[in-house]
Each structure stands twice: as structure tokens, then as C-alpha cells.
């Protein structure tokens, strides 16, 4: 598996030097005889026929593993049943999809049949009859042949290469399991074998073979800072394979105690008596230490008897010198009582301990609800943090459960209660969440495993509109898949008019007497929260919040930044006085100038909300204003300041993935640093309290993992007409020139061919700023026609009006066609340029094999010269076929199986006829115009085809079953309503 190299590899995080006993003579590779070389040659010829490359996806985050696509190695251990051995961290604890590629490049689907709860091995199954052109060989498992000094070969897919053969010598047999860190899978209670073979990512699961071609260990991990590799002994893997071949259950026992192999000198310091040390050394002369209890889990079988620091002497009167012996006893004693003898502080103590079934504390199910997934807390995670094996663990945050606000942690959360009801286990959690109606706001109490001392509380919105899936996934070891059970029928019957009007009171700002006219503005601010269920239009966030300005309290109209409301496929809530929350809807989104208008139901809020008065007079440099806004702590701040500049700005586009940005905008900046710490606010006339500008945040480019945002003011004259039209019940119907322009100084204009007469006219028209504008970027038209304007054009006038301000450009854009005078290639021309209707926001998204597809949105057309297809990849899910087969965001899918797909409807008509678990050929063109072909395997079980489409003002969902389009209706809800009516 590619990410298998870790830096932490010892219990204390330090690197242990590779030392061989002095009595062992390590032969140099250059001194090998011709016979040895020939022996290795024939060995490798045999071994490679059993080694496979595993291309796999862990399709859902579960337990310690996140959803991931990777590659690893495995080797055949049984040719009749078709069993391949590999690592447990490859098979994974959760859903697995993968295939094996044999040495002759034949391919075969893999099905997981066993993953060990603790140790790093697992088994996959393939159909031997599918391999037609190769005589598949199996490797014998011979763990007893692993000895210090044994020359070995690691045969696998090192660094993702098809076949690599690495050589080395075993240097240690008694190493503790490597420590890979917290919140991730770790092996424990086993010895590891150490060697220096310099293996890297992709070699996980490789067989470690001796010169006889026998597998003596399993490659598992290594150190990133050295050439040291860690191999898992095959003793327990061999026993598990024998159970599987016999058709028996692989029993695994535990007493919930983590043991560590500690050297005798350390054991003496922990209380080991001289007599017991002598006895141990006589019984096991080759051992260097004893097993010591490192962690005893609370509420586990050992909790009442064992304690940390206990030195293990025997189990059921059998002296213990290794983990292998301990595992053997416990695995055969599941459900029984064992007698454990330890030495504690120099005294021998014997106690009885119940042996628990290890599989019973290894989760094999999870529930998906409200966009997140949950499971029972696992033994793996409980051991790391020494806590009881109980509780509800969040496998994947998302939707209504975005618990990553604390330090941006995406995993490691444990939910203690929902709606003030404790959730000690998954079954209780399902009952509690099923009883909560859609749209209800409930409290959540939760903690993070890294900081269990801190209890967190939050209020969440239960969203089943966008995240309607409520299903239980249970592992099926017969089929290798996870079976889904729909739980949505457990939802309560929806109630109408559940939102009750509530009262809120605003706090008064502490203003000087001279600014008292601005005090009512504090009651014009509301907090706007936007939860984004699906990533479309390239927008990089899933949740945004800031403040908006109430521009009509009677109609419930709120002005807000488009960096908060990127599109209307979202859940919007409006909060008044940090007391009352009501839903909001998107009424209008300006295509260029970074503002949107929302609407809420005024009947739901009883508060003294003020309609902000908007000025029609543009601000000028030097005008005195009062800034009022909310900082990042949601506190209202005010300051007197002056307008320092009003200038046309150019916000850089995001090079990696286009998303909405403000264009052709006059930015207002002020002589104060306080507004820069606020994402929203107003610039008001201190004497009258009239709003002169709206302060907002603009989404900028993303560089080196950092998202840039620009905070500035936009003049009220920019949006006043739009607000007035919406107030009057008229649609805004904004039209605009679909180009990006930037200011040009007079010296640039002269050099590029602007005549002295035009320059004189500019200087007379705009006394504050002598400027013209040039076209720096043209958007690719929706209809495929060519643009009338070209990059480099210097615009002189629009419809006969001199163009020295961006306000003139906005006013002229309302017409379907405008007359423009310009300078092109030093020649003055007059052209007719069509304008673009703003009603082109994304109205359809298709979910296919983990990819989110849509029509190329406006930001794409602004940055690309040619639209290759109407099927644009907006995002993709981790662990999905789209991710596995390298279908990346910003790609265009132009053909499917040779059929052109110019739009989403054609695409759907083609792909819905393709059977599950078959390959499809795609022609793809990248954003940089590079075309390539690729294949992708369908996986409808975990990634079914679906569609969401805007019909009128509502988004409607569709699913595809057997190639037929089915509208997602509330069938389950209707059944419940009918049943409730019958009962009444």
C-alpha cells in the first residue's frame, strides 16, 4: 500500500539501530557463489508466479482508515480456493473493492474473506478459473524458517512498480510491533521481524522469501528515515489460513491487555525477581526479555485483576516467553476462563480472567445518516487511548455532523449524546437519530479521543433534504461486500408548520453622541450560515457563515456576500440577535459583483429589525464614514474612518480549480485596520446613518494550501437598483458583458494607440482618476459563438458614454446589445457586442461512480478558451472508481465507449445502459487541453448513479435503477402518513 511508510516505528518513537549478534557472520552479496546466484534465480522465477499487484479502494472511511485508493502486493497461498495473503491495512476494516494483476498481466476481481482484528494480515479471494494463460503457483507459509542472518528477498510492487525484488538479511526476530501513530491502524501483541531491505510504498503485503522460495514473513511497514523494514511473522496467519481451508471460524481471543516485550534489565527495574529471571532464562535461553502489561483497558476482562507493569509468567501453567504462545492459548480459549500468573512488585499473583471473543469488539457495521457515518468504538482505537471499548465513533464527518471545527480534526470524534439523550452504543444512536424530525435543531455533546477531558457542545441542523440516506451497512464475509439496509422508514411522520415564531432582542452599540444616528444599524445585521451539501462549481468549502444586511425587514430581504452563498444548492439559515434562527432561501446571485440576496419569513421573527437605508450617491476618496461590522468573534465593532481609495481591482483566479470570484468591481478601502478583521459590515454616513457601502469578503486564489480572501467595500449604488426591483416584486434580470476588464493608465493608453482627443476627454470626465479599461479575459460563450470583444481591447465608450468608471459598464449591460468604441491593435473601431443573461447558474449535477459532473460553470468559461464538452468533472469522492482511475476535477468527459457526450442528458443516456462491474472506455480532455483515454470499472453497489436537478425554484433528486430514471419521492414518508391516518 503506497502510504505504508511511517516515521514512528518504536514504542518511544525513537529509531532502533539494526544490530546483528556478533556471532552471526553476515555474508556480503558480492561474495555469493554461482550456485547461490543460480538458486536465487530459480527461486524468484517460481515466486513471481504467485505474487500479484493489488489495485484497491477502501470505499468508505471506517474505524482507523479513511477512504483511500492505493496499491499493494499480495501472494497466492492456495490455488484451489484462490486465496491471496496480504496486509490487514490493505484489506482494511471497512468496505473494500479491488483486483489483482498477475505476473502475465491477467486481471482478477478480489473479494475480502478475512481481516485480522489486530495483526497486520488478511486474506482476499479470487476465482482461479479466470486465470487462463498462466499456471498460478502458491507459496508455502514457513514461519519457523525465519532466523537471524537468513538471507531474504522481498518480492513485490515496491514504490508502485509492477515487480521489484529487494534483498536483505534478517537482523532481529524480537522487535515490538512498530508504532504508526494515533488515530490509525497499529498492530500490537506480536513480535516483528526486522531487516534492512529499503522497501517503500506499494510493497505492503509482499512475501519475504528464503532461498527455498518459502514465505517466512510478510512485509508490513518500515521507517521513512532509514532502510529498516518490519516484517510480520506468519505464525498466526498460517493458523488462520488453515482454519479457512477447513471451513472453520478463525477464533480470536483477548483479555483486553496490551503487552510489550521488555528486556530483562528493564523487567528487573519493574520488580522481576532474580529467581523468576533465572527460571525464564533457563527455560528460554534465546529470549532477551519478558512480556509486561503496557495497557489494561478499563471495563475489560483484565481490568479487575491485572495492572500496568505486571510481568507475565504463565497462562494456564504454560510459561510464556513470546506473543506467539500467548496468542495460541487465548485463541483456543474463547469463552473460557484462563489462569494468569504475573509478578507484581516482586510477588507472584495468579488470577482467573475470562477470554473474550476479539471479533465481538471489532466493528463490522456502520450507519449513514444526515451526510455522516457512525460506528461502535473499536478495540483498536480504545487501546491507543486506554478507554473502555464502548461509545459511538464518527467514521466520517459531514452533512449535519461537521464536528471538525475544533482544530480542523476530521476524525477522532466520539458522540456522547444527541438531543440531550445519551448514545452509549450504535443501536441507541440509531433509535435517537431516527426519532428526530427533519429540519430540527438539536444539541450534540461530543469529545475528541486526543482530548477526552474536554467536552464539546454544539447545535446542529438535522438535514434530510440533501442527505436523505439513512441506511445500515453490515459486512458480509461470504460475498465480500457490505449489505445495506434502508432505515428511513424509522423516520417520524413530518409535521407541518413546526417552526414557531420567536422573539429576539438586539443589543445596542456603544456609540458616541455624534454617531447616534448609526445606532439603529446594529438591528439591521443578521448572521447568515450556509451549509453546502455537494461540491459543485469548484467551491472549496462545505460550510460558510458571515453577517448579512437586512435591506427590507417587511419582506425579509438580506444582502450577503457570494463568498458565503456560492450557489443556491445549499441550506441557508438566518440568525437574529444570536437568539432566533429561521431558514432562508436564495433570491438572487449577482454573476460578477460578489453579492447575493436572501429572503426569510418575517412572520417567524418577533424583533425590532431595522431596514437599512441605502444611499444612491457614490462614495468618493476622503469621505468620512462610520464602519460598523462584526469581527471573527461575532462581536459588533465600530470605528470612525475615511475612504482611502475607490479603485477597480482584479482578484486573481484560482489556477488549480476555477470557482466564483468577483469581477469588474470598484473596491472601497478605508483608513483603518479594524474592518480588515471583519467579514461583513457597512460604511455609513455618521450624521444620517444612511449606508454608503457594504463591507464583505471576496474569495480569492488558493496557494500552498492557503485560501486567500479579500475584504473590501462595494458602493450601495452597485446593488441599489437590484434591491429596489426585488422589493417591487420584479425579477432583476441582470445582463452584463461577459468579459473581465482592468484599468489602463493614460501613458499605457497613449502607447497603445488611444488618441489625444480621447485622453483629453477622459481627463475632463473623471477628475479623481484618469483611466480607461482594457479587456484582460473573455469568457467562452455558452452558445459556442465567438466573443465580439477580444483580449487587449481598450474600451473607450459604451452606447456613446465615456467609460471611465465601472458604474458606466454596469449600467450599459442591461441591454441585449451595446455599441462599443474601442482601440484594437492601435486602431479605433466601433462594434456591436451582445450581452449575457445572468440566469445561467448551475441547475443540474450528476453523481456517477464517485464523480460529481455538471455543465461547465461560469468560472470555467472565464478561464478556458474552449469548452471541450458539456460534461465537466467538478469533484470526486475519496475511494471511488473516479478517484481510482484518475478522473480528476476540471476534466471534461467527451466520449463514453466511443459515443460523444456533448451534454449531461446524452451522457446519462449512455452510462445508464452500462452494466455494473464492467469496464467503460472514456475519452477525457484536461483543463490544459490534453486529451487521453482511460478505462474505469463500474461500481453501482457503493456508488450508484444519481442526479439532482433544479425544476422551477426547487431542486429535485433522481436515481437510476436498471437504467431507468426514478424520481426521488418521499415514498417512505407518505407510507408513514397513511399509516398514521389509519391509526387515527
Swiss-Prot record:
EC class (word): hydrolase
Domain PDZ, residue spans: 268-346, 756-826
Subcellular location: Nucleus
Keyword Chaperone (UniProt): no
Highest taxon, organism lineage: Eukaryota
Sorted UniProt keywords: Apoptosis, Hydrolase, Nucleus, Protease, Repeat, Serine protease
MF terms (GO), sorted A to Z: serine-type endopeptidase activity
Active-site residue numbers: 89 (charge relay system), 120 (charge relay system), 203 (charge relay system)
EC number(s) from the headed UniProt entry: 3.4.21.-
Name of the protein this chain belongs to: Pro-apoptotic serine protease NMA111
Upper taxonomic lineage: Eukaryota, Fungi, Dikarya, Ascomycota, Saccharomycotina
